[in-house]
Amino acid sequence: MRDTDVATSGTSLAGKHILLGISGGIAAVDSVRIARELRRHGATLTVCMTNSAQNIITPLALSWATQGEIITDWDGDMSQLSRFDAVLVCPATRNILACHLHGIISSPLLMALSAARGNNSPIIFAPSMHSDLAEDSITSEITDSLLAQGAHIIWGVEEEGKRKTVEHTQVVAETAHVINSSNERRKSVVITLGATQSPVDDVRYIQNTSS
């Protein structure tokens, strides 16, 4: 196995092309871990980094982690306009959330988000910010509006006065859930605990003592 390879953990994202957006929160340092976890489940990645994100983690690190294209600035290819199976922004700063909500396109990442909204591709945000910013009523208005537009937002727990991003495994699990939720061949599973009853008629039933 080469240093850039990853061990397969599942196939829930097999054949899926995901745009991983990275904005300028300090949680960008975890981007390598998230990228490799996405690949472990079969995803192909294109990365789009804001200028602020590049001050925290280098494009070289993401190139190693993803083995995919890294978009760092405007260019003639405009790869950010490609059709993706989902756009995952992790971490998502409040600035990115607000700019996307209001249709501001000041970076390739914001253009990718607007294009995804236009073609109804799934958009997933994993915010990271200081607790005071997260609890600001304007932040709630922004996130409520994005949710109403169909975006998905994964909030982490509060620690050390900050709303940190959730664990990388949970980010990937939520992403796979969102992408596969419209799959017509998706299975619905019922898990029961303890005894269960199944009616035979109005007065009789069959019951097992445990599951």
Give each language-model segment a name.
Residues 1-211:
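A cross-family phosphate/adenosyl-ligand binding-site feature
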